[in-house]
Curated annotation (Swiss-Prot):
Pfam families: Ribosomal_L27A. GO terms for biological process: translation. InterPro entries: Ribosomal_uL15, Ribosomal_uL15/eL18, Ribosomal_uL15/eL18_sf, Ribosomal_uL15_bac-type. It comes from Thiobacillus denitrificans (strain ATCC 25259 / T1). Binds to the 23S rRNA. GO terms for molecular function: rRNA binding; structural constituent of ribosome. The lineage of its organism: Bacteria, Pseudomonadati, Pseudomonadota, Betaproteobacteria, Nitrosomonadales. This is Large ribosomal subunit protein uL15.
Length: 144
């Protein structure tokens, strides 16, 4: 076998049907388009979703939900990220300056992930129950 001898197996490829080439072909005259109507004519088709003038499905169904404008405003902070800040008293501004949260964040919440090796004082930042217990166990405090 060589590259110039390779060919598909017998019956693997069907010949394309040539439409509109006489009644003997089985697809002559109307060429499989039926008689009359918009779809039988050249260039005659409708836009996607068009239902012949009846109210289309995408307009019959009610709208649902909304896009929250405040969804991305609260940043999530790992407990282990607080240890790398290098400041004893931490608030939202300190977290932004340290690059722990983005500058666009309007609030932050600390959750229990990782270890906290030193005492810190947290203020103006939300805290989960587990993270609060870990901060207080390390000798730190949380002020609302």
């Amino acid at each position: 076998m060589e590259l110039n001898n390779i060919k598909p197996a017998d019956g693997a490829k069907k010949d394309k049907r040539r439409v509109g080439r006489g009644i003997g072909s089985g697809l002559g005259k109307t060429a499989g388009r039926g008689h009359k109507g918009q779809k039988s004519r050249a260039g005659g088709f409708h836009k996607v979703g068009f239902e012949g003038g009846q109210m289309p499905m995408h307009r019959r169904l009610p709208k649902r939900g909304f896009v929250s404008l405040t969804k991305g405003d609260t940043a999530r902070v790992r407990l282990s990220d607080l240890a790398g800040v290098g400041v004893a008293e931490i608030d939202l501004l300190v977290l932004k300056q340290a690059g722990v949260v983005s500058g666009a964040a309007k609030a932050a919440k600390v959750y229990l992930a990782g270890e906290l090796g030193k005492a810190i004082k947290l203020s103006g930042v939300a805290v989960t129950k587990g993270a609060r217990a870990a901060i207080e166990a390390a000798g730190g405090s949380v002020a609302e």
